[in-house]
């Protein structure tokens, strides 16, 4: 037997075997916090497009948990029953979803958290939300010259929100003459929630100089409430950089800044990371952080917006 000739043949066979064994992304399950929010719609659409680039025949199922824990548990169970290869999850409760995530992983499914971290996932892709909160609230501090009455309008207690509030508080803490009137009211992550909570603030507090809303929909709702009650002189900032906030920064509103995210790029990165893990390529870091940028009335003209068709 000619071993010199045999070894290259065996090596080639092994290489071809590895290529054949590469796993194709055939089915993707996406569970978002709320598809009533354009941000999450863009996340789902970005993930779908990237999955179809990897495999035009991929089956994508995108669902809204509506911030309902039991609903998201059922969605993960359905994904497992459907034998998806990859789940992208925007966890309603990062800790409580751990058992469902473990069940999916035990079934051989790769689970990647998007926008918020979640216990037990293979990897996470999200904005640096602490930095986003800092940027938005440092803007408030600067505009108010370090003094005044400020409100932090909170939201659903997922890590993206708690991290933004953490970053905001860090910026405000450096300005001792800033008084935080409230930081515990939940605007539900929605325009309606922001409007309702802001109406309460405006009734309770005769003087509000600034407000940080944890996302753009809440900021827009808050601005509307101030308009309805004819209250001016309030600087409103938020996080997202959504199309609606672009319009708000160009028109007659009290919204002055938003720390922008890129849900389209986030989703596409998450699919890439998940597909790599599916094929035994671990990411360099367990958590991929995307850097936010502050958009204001001064620089909105150069802002390219979310990198999608939205």
Residue positions per predicted region:
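Bacterial N-terminal signal peptides that target proteins for export
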Residues: 1-8
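A residue-level marker of the well-folded mature domains of exported/periplasmic proteins
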Residues: 22-310
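Bacterial N-terminal signal peptides
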Residues: 8-18
